[in-house]
């Protein structure tokens, strides 16, 4: 084709040269917005999210303030190790929501402010009617004429913004109306501002000061993590802003649909479910269900709320009112929500093992599993066997009852002199077993008791006070000489010695961390390849155009 073009008459070559130059310049240098936008995105790599905590009104003493700051710093560090975003060009400035009474609807200044809102100076820029956002964090507020290139008046100049930040977290500790409600929450949170792609750019947490002292440091961290995940995306209102493409696919040009995701929440079998690709992938793998419309259910109590279903996801950090920290986990399905938002890339190796409902099938959230059935008020063991527990209803509807651990029921803690029976042992090696063993000649209903345990080559051994080690075959029971009753051994599907051979203790910190799957590694390497390939073909195209222009000359 090049040889044919060189046969043009010299008088026509200027025209051909102009056309070719225009085409080359358009395709490579930015005239084609789709190509150019994709090239920019490929060159913009996600980076660790930078979260800036901005402390506002704090009604705490110095000790509790220090505890809050330390706990939140640890939470922010953990979140930053999990999520990456397209970095904000410094500084981060939040676009004002208020201040303009009417905008231009046509002309060169379309969508710019035409008239000020007279009430705005008195009200100021508020976040969810809770507090005023610092003016130094906000964009300019000005009024424009219909055709002018410069604003007619600048009411508020642009603030200096927040440097080296992708998300601003406003922190308050104020005894608000919400803090005085019946549930007496430790904290609550919401988002304030979003960027042009829908990602939350700012949000706030309010810690209720009157409840602060009653929470342990571990529980404080867990609740703060729960709330931070809310403001970053785990909120029913934000589900509707999720993008059609994950950030990974969008950056690798595997998906070019910039629309928001359509109908992410759907009612299936009477329950609202989050049916987005990564969430469904993780849910199907966890529950061992391949139904097309299977996904984790959301809380439904008077409407669809911003939490997982209490029963199906029992033990997940994003259920309402999470349990004790050592029995609550940041699971893969929760992390998948953020992948599906289209705003973050996620490090799944940071997820914790979540064993509730594992391989229980498609109907686990619809019917009570036989292995998790209990009678209200009955004393037994938590499903992970780390604590004794009491059978309670999980929701006001009373659809499901499970064994719930309460403070003081941990087998790893306690005073051995205060044991419920003289046979119990409280230690880091102790777990909960259903037993009705007694030194008396009376029979009683089995209840949860704490005994020491060992795992050797997958075999479970149990030790009571004043006994030696006894093998406890899965699904069977053992009797002890001179004692009445039995110790019930956990079923084969239980988790005490599962893949943990020769481990003599199970603690909250020793639960195995999930490693990123091979598929995620493949995706990462593909992104690198795709980016390099795109750059390679762009360079070849430039050389092609240059050579063609040279021949024309």
Regions found by a protein language model. Give the residues of each.
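Intrinsic-disorder/low-complexity regions
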Residues: 1, 11, 163, 517, ...
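A detector of low-complexity, intrinsically disordered, Ser/Thr/Gly/Pro/Ala-rich segments
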Residues: 1, 436, 520-526, 536, ...
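N-terminal signal peptide
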Residues: 4-9, 17-35, 530, 548-553
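Bacterial N-terminal signal peptides that target proteins for export
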Residues: 6-15, 536-540
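Terminal low-complexity, poorly structured segments
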Residues: 11, 19, 294, 522, ...
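Extracellular zinc-dependent metalloprotease catalytic-domain scaffold
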Residues: 21-225, 231-516
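Extracellular mucin-like PTS segments
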Residues: 509-533
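Cleavable C-terminal sorting propeptides in eukaryotic secreted/cell-surface proteins
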Residues: 527-553
